[in-house]
Amino acid sequence: MTDECQPVAVSRRICAPAREIFQVLADPVRHPQFDGSQMLRGAGSATVISAAGDVFVMKMYYAAIGDYEMNNHVVEYEHDRRIGWEPAAGRGHPDYDPGDPAAARWGQRWSFELTPDGPDATIVTEIYDCSAAPEHERLAIDNGSIWAEAMAKTLERLDALCARQGNQPSPA
């Protein structure tokens, strides 16, 4: 019998409208600025996420692997409300198979939900769901709970980034 795996969710109230926060989340170039895991090194291109089905590449670093890339398949996209992707191993990752790139998708999903809390604030929830991953992989990462601290740090950094952005004059 296997234990049921529940998604890990961390929330924070950020004093910025959902629209502004979503703009940051939909721009992979900005992801290293708020990444709480400190694994993200940069985006593979300057393309902004605009729909489910998009794929964006992130340059990553993990001590056991070194430098590598992840191909992130956007599976959830509701403008200003929800965005989510499923990562797959990319170039430099030991699980990457250029002949079958879809084979390196592990059943993990990262997403952000934005719930307006008045006109100038938003409850942001980051969700990590590994329920579709093989059981041995879920157990190796304690059903995703190992990410909770990094997720809290991500939201803290996103809050600070949006606060700085909110103090900038709007482009004309």
Regions found by a protein language model. Give the residues of each.
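Hydrophobic ligand-binding cavity/cleft-lining segments
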Residues: 1-47, 51-52, 172
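Intrinsic-disorder/low-complexity, polar/charged segments enriched in Ser/Thr/Lys/Arg/Asp/Glu/Gln
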Residues: 5-13, 18-19, 55, 69, ...
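Hydrophobic pocket/interface hotspot
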Residues: 20-25, 31, 56-58, 74, ...
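Surface loops and adjacent helix of pleckstrin homology
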Residues: 36, 61, 88, 127
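Short secondary-structure capping micro-motifs at structural edges
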Residues: 44-46, 57-61, 70-72
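Hydrophobic-ligand binding "helix-grip"
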Residues: 62-121
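A conserved amphipathic terminal alpha-helix motif
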Residues: 103-106, 123, 127-172
